[in-house]
Curated annotation (Swiss-Prot):
Tissue: Expressed exclusively in roots.
Catalytically driven reaction(s): Hydrolysis of terminal, non-reducing beta-D-glucosyl residues with release of beta-D-glucose
Species name: Arabidopsis thaliana (Mouse-ear cress)
Protein name, UniProt field: Beta-glucosidase 21
Chain sites annotated for binding a beta-D-glucoside: 55, 158, 203-204, 346, 418, 468, 475-476, 484
Signal peptide: 1-24
Record keyword Chloroplast present: no
Length: 524
């Protein structure tokens, strides 16, 4: 009755209720807990582990699987893959049922996998043949996950371009890849979309483009000869990476158009892989802007087109004609073409203003006018660097990066698609040493706490977290010498899996929680 007498007051009350409902939906709600555990996170938060087809499956001659880019790259250039290859990898193809039981043992909710393009289309295109045995393998894998109560998250492309497309037109160097990727994505969405609702089109496009076509550290190893280590290579640093990314982004947009037609109630995104940066010298006015600039080049390069429809302005300003342009139609397809931001976070470093770039030797890193420094102006390293660590450990950077994405990109939903710690054990590698991975345990503890603070204090909308990786596996140019798994794989003894200390910690964390964390905030 009162609302009839005071319509304006009633309208204001209604708006207040609507705003409150919206806020409740958008902002994460964290339970009050006395110890860090699964219970410290919002209801429905997903915890899982991650792998990628090429890194774990093996079975390269089964199901009529065609050769992939990394197969040929490692055969032709064994020294670029630490003398290793992924012909067998960790034999996930034959052992996935056993490995799914390891996931259950961890108490995880979800599992991130990728589909090998050439296991579906051995020659890259549907018209050249479909491997029904390959199609069936992924059906059986997905069904086994679902039977065990584990939600599948599927990556359409994790760096394994069919070699036939590389040979035919240069893979992602050609715009022909756009229609071929759309066809492949259409097929897997149609085939598996009824039971898989969470998808990633591309894994780490920055790494794929920069390391593969500018730095030459990953397949196909293209770079200019002035780049250290590239004296005998083919490629054009400072150009090809931008072309590859342009084609990749257009391929993503085409795939998402199909996805939204075919997969009802699904979500799709890209898994980005930025580091966090701290200014090299806080007193230098040139260093502070380097953080946002390098993040525009590293993260915004592929994220901003999927939100706004175009590249970051700073990239257009600094690169000029070397940065391809989207057409109006391409911009329209790219804009708002993700439902969440996928984030892979491992480490942080310092950013320093690069005052004297060499215009005769363009490269992605030089283009951003930023140099990366392991120590700041006071000669202090970032975070900590355990003796066998592959990368510096800096959990503060994780929280800062999450807050940065929230603030810059309008508070999107974020899924942590990879977070993990690499061990290079060298001559000390053994089952006993490898399973006593206390540094990985501490890494996970610190990063889970940092993520919890980002969610509960900074109100970042993180909804899932995947540890990289379930198993030690083939780590690209490092071969099997860099171990990231929660389970140790004995490469000398039948690929036997052994539970590591980090797996025990994660299992307890996801079960009933762990003892109250003794970590202090300044230790992060």
């Amino acid at each position: 009755m009162a609302l009839q007498k005071f319509p304006l007051m009633g309208l204001l009350l209604l708006l207040t209720i609507l705003v409150s409902v919206t806020t409740a939906v958008d902002d994460p709600v964290c339970p009050a807990t006395s110890k860090l555990s699964r219970a410290s996170f919002p209801n429905g938060f997903l915890f899982g582990t991650a792998t990628a087809a090429f890194q774990v499956e093996g079975a390269i001659n089964e199901t009529c699987r065609g050769p992939a880019l990394w197969d040929i790259y490692c055969r032709r250039n064994p020294e670029r893959c630490s003398g290793d290859h992924a012909d067998v990898a960790v034999d996930f193809f034959h052992r996935y049922k056993e490995d799914i039981q390891l996931m259950k043992n961890l108490n995880t909710d979800a599992f991130r996998l990728s589909i090998a393009w050439s296991r579906i289309f051995p020659h890259g295109r549907k018209e050249k043949g479909v491997s029904q045995a390959g199609v069936q393998f992924y059906h059986e894998l997905i069904d086994e996950l679902l039977k065990n109560g584990i939600v599948p998250f599927v990556t359409v492309f994790h760096w394994d371009t069919p070699q036939d497309l590389e040979d035919e037109y240069g893979g992602f160097l050609s715009q022909n890849i756009v229609k071929d990727f759309r066809e492949y994505a259409d097929y897997v969405f149609t085939e598996y979309g009824g039971k898989v609702k969470n998808w990633i089109t591309f894994n780490e496009p920055w790494v794929f483009a920069h390391a593969g076509y500018d730095l030459g550290k990953k397949a196909p190893g293209r770079c200019s000869r002035y780049v250290p280590g590239c004296e005998d290579r083919e490629g054009q640093s400072g150009k090809e990476a931008y072309l590859v990314s342009h084609n990749l982004l257009n391929a993503h947009a085409e795939a998402v158009e199909v996805f939204r037609q075919k997969v009802k109630g699904g979500k799709i995104g890209i898994a980005h892989s930025p580091a966090w940066f701290e200014p090299h010298d806080l007193k230098d006015s040139n260093d502070a802007p380097t953080v946002s600039r390098v993040l525009d080049f590293m993260l915004g390069w592929h994220l901003e087109p999927t939100t706004s429809g175009d590249y970051p302005q700073i990239m257009k300003d600094l690169l000029g004609y070397r940065l391809p342009q989207f057409t109006a139609a391409q911009k329209a397809k790219l804009k708002d073409s993700t439902d969440f931001v996928g984030l892979n976070y491992y480490t942080s470093t310092f950013s320093n203003y690069n005052e004297k770039p060499d215009p005769s030797k363009p490269s992605w890193k030089q283009d951003s006018l930023v140099s990366w420094e392991p120590k700041n102006v006071d000669h202090s390293a970032i975070g900590s660097m355990p003796l066998t660590a592959a990368l510096p450990v800096y959990a503060k950077g994780f929280r800062k990066l999450l807050k940065y994405i929230k603030d810059k990109y309008a508070n999107p939903e974020i899924m942590i698609m990879e977070n993990g710690y690499g061990d290079k054990l060298g001559t000390t590698d053994s089952v006993d040493v490898g399973t006593a991975d206390h540094n990985r345990k501490y890494y996970l503890q610190r990063h889970l706490l940092a993520m919890n603070e980002a969610i509960c204090i900074d109100k970042v909308r993180v909804t899932g977290y995947f540890v990289w990786s379930l198993l030690d596996n083939f780590e690209w140019q490092d071969g099997y010498k860099n171990r990231f798994g929660l389970y140790y794989v004995d490469f000398k003894n039948n690929l036997t899996r052994y539970e590591k200390e980090s797996a025990k910690y994660y299992k307890d964390f996801l079960a009933q929680g762990v003892r109250p964390s003794a970590l202090k905030r300044d230790e992060l």
